[in-house]
UniProtKB/Swiss-Prot annotation:
SUPFAM superfamilies hit by this protein: RNA polymerase subunit RPB10
EC number: 2.7.7.6
Cofactor note: Binds 1 zinc ion.
Protein origin, superkingdom: Archaea
GO terms for biological process, alphabetical: DNA-templated transcription
Binding, Zn(2+): 7, 10, 44-45
Pfam families, alphabetized: RNA_pol_N
Name the record gives this protein: DNA-directed RNA polymerase subunit Rpo10
Length: 65
């Protein structure tokens, strides 16, 4: 839902890389190459960025009581 600040497994900071990753992948670059360029080498960190889905805009529609 919200951009992952850290890797869920190892705790490495990923938030500073997320928007660059997203921008480059949407521009058509290969996700694996982008992760290599950003220095994300651990498979747990790669999984965290690759599998993240932004749902915050859809969730914000509902009221909170």
């Amino acid at each position: 839902m919200i951009v992952p600040v850290r890797c869920f497994t190892c705790g490495k900071v990923l938030a500073d890389k997320y928007y660059e990753f997203k921008k480059r992948v949407e521009a058509g670059e290969d996700p694996g190459k982008v992760l290599d360029d950003l220095g994300v080498e651990r498979y747990c960190c790669r999984r965290t960025l690759l599998s993240h889905v932004e749902l915050i805009d859809q969730v914000m529609v509902y009221k909170v009581y």
